[in-house]
């Protein structure tokens, strides 16, 4: 598989060559005179493409918002799950209404188990998404800033795991 002219220019640029050195090097390789203007044109196109991409901070914010929405959705499901357990327990005691006057709704154990499975799956998805985003951001950060994810980012994983354990259904 041959590497395109554009890819060669970008690779040499990323290796630290300046445009005139790139033109000289590629002139030897492609058996024709490569001008510095050609190299600068390729680099300008690359900069234009890169400027259209979202910033690292925008990506972090989007990931944070998505994880927050998942956490809120999970809390809503957890409230439904707890209400299902409350109704099931009241039903098992033979009650037709709760002490607060609300009617007891019939709930099947399979429905409770399915809801618990869904809540646990959301936990797993949230943790996996956060860890994957930290890996990606850590990799990008390490190539651009020479650092892995910050300690505060790693602490947030521990807090998330603790939150998941605290919110896990108690049976």
Swiss-Prot record:
It holds the Pfam family TerS_C. The keyword DNA-binding applies. GO terms for molecular function: DNA binding. It comes from the Viruses. InterPro entries: TerS_C, TerS_N. Keywords: DNA-binding, Viral genome packaging, Viral release from host cell. Signal peptide: none annotated. Homononamer; forms a ring-like structure through which genomic DNA is translocated into the capsid. Heterodimer with the terminase large subunit; the active complex is probably heterooligomeric. Belongs to the P23virus small terminase family. The terminase small subunit binds to the packaging initiation site and regulates the ATPase activity of the terminase large subunit. The terminase lies at a unique vertex of the procapsid and is composed of two subunits, a small terminase subunit involved in viral DNA recognition (packaging sequence), and a large terminase subunit. Both terminase subunits heterooligomerize and are docked on the portal protein to form the packaging machine. This is Terminase, small subunit.
